Amino acid sequence: MAFKIIASQCTQCGACEFECPSNAIELKGEKYVIDPKKCTECKGVFEIQQCASVCPMPKTCVPA
C-alpha cells in the first residue's frame, strides 16, 4: 500500500519531496501528490516513512 498526502493539511513546504527515496512525490498544480506506483513506503530503506517523518503537519502523509 502506498502513502497519500492529505491536501487540506499540506502547507506546500516541499520537505517530503526532497526526502522521498523513490522520487514518488511531486508538486502538481498547487498541491503535492504521491505516485502510488512509485511509493515503496520506504521499505528496505528506512524504518519509518520519510514523508511522514519530515512533514511539519501531523498526519498529513498517511497510508492510502
UniProtKB/Swiss-Prot annotation:
<keyword id="KW-0677">Repeat</keyword>
<keyword id="KW-0813">Transport</keyword>
<feature type="binding site">
    <location>
        <position position="10"/>
    </location>
    <ligand>
        <name>[4Fe-4S] cluster 1</name>
    </ligand>
</feature>
<keyword id="KW-0408">Iron</keyword>
<feature type="binding site">
    <location>
        <position position="13"/>
    </location>
    <ligand>
        <name>[4Fe-4S] cluster 1</name>
    </ligand>
</feature>
<keyword id="KW-0535">Nitrogen fixation</keyword>
<dbReference type="Pfam" id="PF12838">
    <property type="entry name" value="Fer4_7"/>
</dbReference>
<keyword id="KW-0004">4Fe-4S</keyword>
<feature type="binding site">
    <location>
        <position position="16"/>
    </location>
    <ligand>
        <name>[4Fe-4S] cluster 1</name>
    </ligand>
</feature>
<feature type="binding site">
    <location>
        <position position="51"/>
    </location>
    <ligand>
        <name>[4Fe-4S] cluster 2</name>
    </ligand>
</feature>
<dbReference type="InterPro" id="IPR017900">
    <property type="entry name" value="4Fe4S_Fe_S_CS"/>
</dbReference>
<keyword id="KW-0411">Iron-sulfur</keyword>
<keyword id="KW-0614">Plasmid</keyword>
<dbReference type="GO" id="GO:0051539">
    <property type="term" value="F:4 iron, 4 sulfur cluster binding"/>
</dbReference>
<protein>
    <recommendedName>
        <fullName>Ferredoxin-like protein in nif region</fullName>
    </recommendedName>
</protein>
<dbReference type="GO" id="GO:0046872">
    <property type="term" value="F:metal ion binding"/>
</dbReference>
<keyword id="KW-0479">Metal-binding</keyword>
<keyword id="KW-0249">Electron transport</keyword>
<feature type="domain" description="4Fe-4S ferredoxin-type">
    <location>
        <begin position="2"/>
        <end position="30"/>
    </location>
</feature>
<dbReference type="GO" id="GO:0009399">
    <property type="term" value="P:nitrogen fixation"/>
</dbReference>
<feature type="binding site">
    <location>
        <position position="42"/>
    </location>
    <ligand>
        <name>[4Fe-4S] cluster 2</name>
    </ligand>
</feature>
<dbReference type="InterPro" id="IPR017896">
    <property type="entry name" value="4Fe4S_Fe-S-bd"/>
</dbReference>
<feature type="binding site">
    <location>
        <position position="39"/>
    </location>
    <ligand>
        <name>[4Fe-4S] cluster 2</name>
    </ligand>
</feature>
<feature type="binding site">
    <location>
        <position position="55"/>
    </location>
    <ligand>
        <name>[4Fe-4S] cluster 1</name>
    </ligand>
</feature>
<feature type="binding site">
    <location>
        <position position="20"/>
    </location>
    <ligand>
        <name>[4Fe-4S] cluster 2</name>
    </ligand>
</feature>
